Amino acid sequence: IDGEIDAGSSTGSVSSILPALNDAFSDATSVGLILKMNSPGGSPVQSAIVNDEINRLRKLHPNKPVYVVVEDMCASGCYYIAAAADRIYVSQASIVGSIGVLMSSFGFTGLMDKLGIERRLMTAGENKGLMDPFSPYSAKHKEFTQAMLKEIHEQFIAAVRVGRGKRLKENPEIFSGLFWTGSHAITLGLADGLGTVDSVARDVLKAEDVIDYTVREGLSDRVLKKFGAAVGEGAARALGNEWLKPR
C-alpha cells in the first residue's frame, strides 16, 4: 500500500488490495505474507473492509502469518489495516499512529456578511445543507457531526485493541490522534520491532524468495479509468441539464 487509502487508489483500495491478499494466501508455496505499507491513511470504510478481510483470511489459513512492514509512514487508516497483522515492523524514524477521525470544511459566512453576499440554499430535508460552507454551522449540526466521528473512532479503537491485544500499553494518548516515531511506537505496543521487507522475509519467515502479489494497473487501465470517469461526469451533467428543462 503506497499513498492514500481511497476507493480510486491503484494500490490503496479494496479492489486492489483484496485480490492481492487472496492470491498470496491461496498460493500453496507461500509461507507467510508481508504487507509493505507507506500511507498517511484515508477512507475508514476501505480500511475497515481490508482489516476484516485480513482477519478472515488469517482464520482460514492459520499457518500463514501476516507481517506488516512500515516504511516512511503508517498513520490513521493505514494503521487501521496494519492492526490486523500478527506483527508490525517499523524503521526507527517511521511515523506511526494517528488513531483518530477527522472531517474538515471551511466557513465563509463572516466574509459573506462583510461583502453583502446572501446565500440562497433550498433543500428538501431540514438537514440536507449540513456542512455547507456558505451557511451558518448550527450547534445541532455540530453535535450530530461530532457524534458520528466518535462512533467511527470507537470502531477504529476496537479494531486496534483486538489486533494488538495485551501488547498495547494503557496510555490515553494512543487513541488521541497523536503519532510517534517507529522507535516510540514499539514502546507503546503499536509496533513489535525494527525491520524491513528483506529482513523480515529472511530472518522471521526464513523465506528464500519474495514474490510480489501487488495488483498493478497497466497504462490501458489508467486511460480507461480516466476516460470512463470523464464520460460519466459528462453524461451526468448532460442528463442533469436535460431534467431541469421545462416541459
Where are these regions (language model features)?
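N-terminal organellar transit peptides
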Residues: 1-68, 72-76, 85-91, 102-247
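Alpha-helical bundle segments that constitute or directly flank the non-heme di-iron/ferroxidase center
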Residues: 79
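Extracytoplasmic ligand-binding site segments that recognize negatively charged/polar headgroups
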Residues: 98
